[in-house]
Amino acid sequence: MRFFLMQRNHQVAVIDIAEKTGDIIDVAEVLSAQRIPLGAKHSDGSFDVLSLRKWWAGRGIPASRSGLEHALEALHIPYAELLLVKCSGLSLSDQYWVTPCDAPQNWHDVNFYENDFSDDVGRALFGEGILSAQPDLCSPCNTSDGFLQKRWRIADGKRILLKAGSGIYKQEPYNEIVASALYDALGMPHVPYWLVEQGGQVMSACACFTNEHTELVTAAQFMRLLPQAQGVSNWEHFNACCQAVEIPDAREAVCNMLAADFILANTDRHLGNFGFLRDSETLEWKGTAPIYDSGTSLWQMTLTRAICAEAMVPAKPFETSQQSQLKLIAPYVDLPLERLDGFSNKVEEIFQTAAQFDDGRAAKIAAAVSGRIQMLRFNRA
């Protein structure tokens, strides 16, 4: 089937998508080179069907998503990639989508910012019963990434992302609350999170931070702005891209975020978990995105007895250990750490409500956070 790849109402390319699998099989024509998704380019800046296919596949629900297999069965969908076609590739992160060449649609009539969407896919992803014999598959849940169970819902006109916990402690939702409290204390722009209970489990909730005019460009996508020369580190290349488009204070904002990640022992700040905001109509860069997705942190998969501030913690995205990454960013970190006096009490208070915790876990995490704050202060001295 032949489609237009679109950005809002701008035609970007003519592409062919396999009807049975949902895979992109050809790029017939590029119509607007400047609007090609940055993430759909190779690292050398080139663009072809292989790079577009990789971008398209990465847009969908990953195979690692908890409960995906059962959800596909309930929705009568053989391949997860087909869910992308069912929702026209629409997302609540950006304004790219596809529409049939022989029956093109208008962006304003279909996008998830201005139009309601079904909860059928969200229900299936959480193992809930489908309310219709013919489920409505047009949902932003189809273009949500990550391995944790999650779903988009509409509440009071707002688009809200709900995300569950994992493992024996189900800790990730509480981690988001701790992270929000940390960012509040330090005066850092971030996406606010709160807790909700649904179906007997506690989940984190946050409102969509993009809109019909503004898109998220992750750091991984952003770094395709320029070809990355062999031997140039990701850190060096990231800074070169920031300088090329003159985003003010981008390096300092990212370094402050990574310093906060050190406090939180965040192990998953990969290049898709932070980024920049761009006007999807003018393509003007608006600045760094607020910090989001900090749940994989605070020793969430570590047994209570093994939690320790000094333990080696892996890091992303520019170094493999927290200590080595801290050395890299230290010259650019400017956080008012004096505001964190007594912050460990707040951490323990938040975790005291976690039903899956064993005795002493909340206090152990709070003590480790306090220790890491002191370690960061020492590195700053």
Predicted regions and their residues:
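Phosphate/dinucleotide-binding and metal-coordinating scaffold of catalytic cores
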Residues: 1-259, 263-265, 277-381
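Conserved protein-kinase catalytic-loop segment immediately C-terminal to the catalytic Asp
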Residues: 270, 275-277
